[in-house]
Amino acid sequence: MGANVLIMAGGTGGHVFPALACAREFQARGYTVHWLGTPRGIENDLVPAAGLPLHLINVSGLRGKGKLSLLKAPFVLIKAVLQARRVIRQLKPVCVLGFGGYVTGPGGVAAKLSGVPVIVHEQNAVAGTANRLLVPLAARVCEAFPDTFGASQSRRTTGNPVRTELFLETPREALAGRKARLLILGGSLGAEPLNKLLPEALAQVAPELRPEVFHQAGKNHDEVTAERYRAAGVEAQVQPFIKDMAQAYGWADLVVCRAGALTVSELAAAGLPSMLVPLPHAIDDHQTRNAEYLAREGAAFLMPQRTTGAADLAARLTEVLMQPERLDNMAQAARRLAKPGATHDVVNICLEVAHG
């Protein structure tokens, strides 16, 4: 067994999936990977399923909490730091790599107190609270999007680690002589505004121009979304989940979705044009900043939810569906932004820090 590495990531798939990609790379290089998480996050399902040992500490977020919770917060955080420090003393990792989530703050402090180098990776264009607080303690700071952390000698722009199978190598089937294919992603829990907006918008696109539609509506949202399409007179395949994202991306010519960091990175990896509707109440409006990264380079349209109605979306869809060459140009722009070496680069940075 090789030396230990400790990964800290929790809460959402946006933190956990890039961390899993790095875990696999560490393992391929002979390292033993352990994971630090919290009892309530998605890591409790994904990490054991990946065959990785999961260590838990008790910590949660502070935003929006009542006065009593805020009074207790220092004691909760101190306890979490002590829990994390026990794990670190037991494992003696050569480095600790944090991807965000509530676990990252106490875990990073514990690593620093234990003399173990800390590396931070931020997936979004706006850094999360835990990662921002850890920057002064970190030996290196990796960012997916340029200038997330500003000028710093410890900063490295790496991109987001994504699954290698998403970097599509086979050319996409030419649009000539067939209908375009539209992929709509609502996320695992469903983006209800998109589930309502798309059937209405597609009904306003001329039938001869209307694309084939595959709509991932989210858990418990597929039946009502399918009924909306039927009522609108639009043919669509609606599913709650997509098991094979590489296949779905390979099928699509255009994607409508939110602008989570991982989604934006996957769109670039797959070389797909997109219409991005950022989640309007995302913390620090980070999804808008993520979307701007693709939109600035001509790879996506940024369509704010508050100002985008069915008629607006229908007009934009009609515009690009009438110009296949524009979709091609957007796809090429997306591909130029892809970072196929992100996983390799993040792991290299960790090992350079760990071994000097």
Curated annotation (Swiss-Prot):
Cell wall formation. Catalyzes the transfer of a GlcNAc subunit on undecaprenyl-pyrophosphoryl-MurNAc-pentapeptide (lipid intermediate I) to form undecaprenyl-pyrophosphoryl-MurNAc-(pentapeptide)GlcNAc (lipid intermediate II). The keyword Kinase does not apply. It comes from the Bacteria. Its EC number is 2.4.1.227. This is UDP-N-acetylglucosamine--N-acetylmuramyl-(pentapeptide) pyrophosphoryl-undecaprenol N-acetylglucosamine transferase. One of its GO terms (cellular component) is plasma membrane. It is an enzyme of class 2 (transferase). It is a peripheral membrane protein. CDD domains: GT28_MurG. NCBIfam families: murG. One of its GO terms (molecular function) is undecaprenyldiphospho-muramoylpentapeptide beta-N-acetylglucosaminyltransferase activity. The gene is murG. It is found in: Cell inner membrane. Belongs to the glycosyltransferase 28 family. MurG subfamily. Its main location: membrane. The keyword Membrane applies. UDP-N-acetyl-alpha-D-glucosamine binds at residues 12-14, 124, 163, 188, 242, 261-266, 287. One of its GO terms (biological process) is regulation of cell shape. InterPro entries: GlcNAc_MurG (IPR006009), Glyco_trans_28_C (IPR007235), GlycoTrans_28_N (IPR004276). It catalyses: di-trans,octa-cis-undecaprenyl diphospho-N-acetyl-alpha-D-muramoyl-L-alanyl-D-glutamyl-meso-2,6-diaminopimeloyl-D-alanyl-D-alanine + UDP-N-acetyl-alpha-D-glucosamine = di-trans,octa-cis-undecaprenyl diphospho-[N-acetyl-alpha-D-glucosaminyl-(1->4)]-N-acetyl-alpha-D-muramoyl-L-alanyl-D-glutamyl-meso-2,6-diaminopimeloyl-D-alanyl-D-alanine + UDP + H(+). The lineage of its organism: Bacteria, Pseudomonadati, Pseudomonadota, Gammaproteobacteria, Pseudomonadales. Gene3D superfamilies: Glycogen Phosphorylase B (3.40.50.2000). Keywords: Cell cycle, Cell division, Cell inner membrane, Cell membrane, Cell shape, Cell wall biogenesis/degradation, Glycosyltransferase, Membrane, Peptidoglycan synthesis, Transferase. Disulfide bonds: none annotated. Pathway: Cell wall biogenesis; peptidoglycan biosynthesis.
